[in-house]
Amino acid sequence: QLQLSSPVCMGILNITPDSFSDGAELARSDRSEFRFDRDKVLFKAAQMVRDGALILDVGGESTRPGASPVPVDEELDRTIPVLEILRAEFDILLSIDTSTPEVMSAALAAGAGLVNDVRALTRAGAKQIVAKAQAAPAVCLMHMQGQPVSMQETFSYDSVVDEVFSFLKHRIADTA
């Protein structure tokens, strides 16, 4: 069970060939095939755990500015095998970084105990997946203005702190 009485460190494993944060260190793609490097994933995860991570977060769709959406099957192929490997190797809270209900469902079945959603469970079916999960997962609701492909074009706030606070307050009320 996730305890938030003190700060918790989350290690991020981006299983994407176009990640903005790790330069696609853990995954490669050519025109016909996507693959992740199992040894690199396990090495990086072990390093994060040694460094104090209490959660390992696995993402298969980049949300960097300008990123294109990833088909559901591709996101599943990127994330579920990694979650299964991590579950077999580590006794740690696993998180799925997704906004896609089908990926949430498969990830929870594969051992994830936290849903980390940059779209704050706004996609159709997302709230229901979390609500109906056999073991109630923790949820991390995040804020994103617009969509990755266009977020830099429509970026505008009158009061960023007030608007993000209000958005998250409403999302919490709606998902409770």
Where are these regions (language model features)?
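Short, well-ordered coil/turn segments that N-cap beta-strands
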Residues: 5-9, 53-54, 90-92, 111-113, ...
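Conserved anion-binding
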Residues: 15-22, 63-64, 110, 118-176
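Conserved, mostly hydrophobic/aromatic
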Residues: 13, 48, 52, 97, ...
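Glycine-rich anion/phosphate-binding loops
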Residues: 21-47, 74-77, 120, 124, ...
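Glycine-rich, proline-tolerant flexible connector loops at the mouths of alpha/beta enzymes
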Residues: 19-26, 54-81
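Glycine-rich beta-to-alpha transition loops that act as phosphate-gripper elements at the mouths
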Residues: 13, 94-102, 119-121
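N-terminal amphipathic alpha-helix/helix-capping segment at the start of soluble metabolic enzymes
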Residues: 1-20
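Alpha-helix-loop-beta-strand connector modules within alpha/beta enzyme cores
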Residues: 68-96, 102-105, 132-144, 166
